[in-house]
Amino acid sequence: MALVSMRQLLDHAADDSYGLPAFNVNNMEQVKAIMDAARATSSPVILQGSAGARKYAGEPFLRHLIAAAVEAYPEIPVVMHQDHGASPAVCMGAIKSGFSSVMMDGSLKEDGKTPADYDYNVSVTAKVVELAHAVGVSVEGELGCLGSLETGKGEAEDGHGAEEALDHSKLLTDPDEAAQFVKATQCDALAIAIGTSHGAYKFTRKPTGDILAIDRIKAIHQRIPTTHLVMHGSSSVPQELLEEIRTYGGDIKETYGVPVEEIQEGIRYGVRKVNIDTDIRLAMTAAIRRVGAKNKSEFDPRKFMAAAMEEAKKVCIARFEAFGSAGKAEKIRAIELDEMAKRYASGELAQVVH
């Protein structure tokens, strides 16, 4: 199956009331673990590359790894998504490289650190939407900044994220402003701020409504029912993985992620894309530490990475099943990007705003 537009997958998810984990990838082992999990569960896949991943692996390597996944797993619909594009130029570069979906994160200025104003965000996002939709590529925007409601601070990850203290007007997306934003930009998906943040250190305690505003999702979805909501920074940070890392010599302080049941609640209210990176990192790190501790003479990196892939695969299977995407791959027939471009041009995919 060819690469597909993220809009196609998220439309299907909305019609069938499920969510899709979007996994960040940096190397072959992560791609293979995710795709093996997708095959085991018959789930469609969103593979995404962050700015850090593009810097680490290089965009050509990421692009060809994902192309290999499409070839090796022909029964699985795959989206190749560029995560957190810092400018229209970055997004256009990704489109030219063959990405089928891009994110224009205009919540921050081009440096990826300074919070931007609303008008700037609308301007750059609308520009990317116009150019991307002309070739059938979907666009994710962002309104509000990722950050902790506990500390009032953003969380930089992979070279992207607000570095200054933020007030609640930035840390929580306003439903009325979300409606205005979607009407002005016509983005396909919208990343919203509800108290999540990148990285492993999201919450100092199991999150409740005062630090994780799941109820905000419902209010936003009521205003923009056809725009697919996105939860960034939504790894669950499994406590058993933290404990295993500590058991085999790691030093990770107490921390909590976004509980799976809270994500499931978000899916009921319109979340369709759930970004996950840290959980895979933790799974692979735990496996590598375990192999090294139990086999001190081992020096074949394949032994370490095979165990890491298997541990990551378990996490991915669990998320596909928990979010409801298992069993959906065979129900999807790929729509070519040229056809998506025609649908955008006809107005068929215009967003509904209340």
UniProtKB/Swiss-Prot annotation:
GO biological process, one term: glycolytic process
E.C. no: 4.1.2.13
Binding site for D-glyceraldehyde 3-phosphate: 50
Keyword Zinc found: yes
Activity-regulation annotation: Activity is stimulated by Fe(2+) in autotrophically grown cells.
Pathway(s) annotated for this protein in UniProt: Carbohydrate biosynthesis; Calvin cycle; Carbohydrate degradation; glycolysis; D-glyceraldehyde 3-phosphate and glycerone phosphate from D-glucose: step 4/4
Cofactor: Zn(2+)
Organism superkingdom: Bacteria
CDD domains registered for this protein in UniProt: TBP_aldolase_IIB
InterPro entries linked to this entry: Aldolase_TIM, Class_II_FBP_aldolase, FBA_II, Fruct_bisP_Calv
Record has Metal-binding as a keyword: yes
Gene3D superfamilies linked: Aldolase class I
Span of the signal peptide: none
Binding-site list for Zn(2+) 2: 105, 142
Residues binding dihydroxyacetone phosphate: 199, 233-235, 275-278
Record field: catalytic activity: beta-D-fructose 1,6-bisphosphate = D-glyceraldehyde 3-phosphate + dihydroxyacetone phosphate
Record's cofactor remark: Binds 2 Zn(2+) ions per subunit. One is catalytic and the other provides a structural contribution.
Function text: Catalyzes the aldol condensation of dihydroxyacetone phosphate (DHAP or glycerone-phosphate) with glyceraldehyde 3-phosphate (G3P) to form fructose 1,6-bisphosphate (FBP) in gluconeogenesis and the reverse reaction in glycolysis.
Family membership: Belongs to the class II fructose-bisphosphate aldolase family.
Name of the protein in its database record: Fructose-bisphosphate aldolase
Gene name of the encoded protein: cbbA
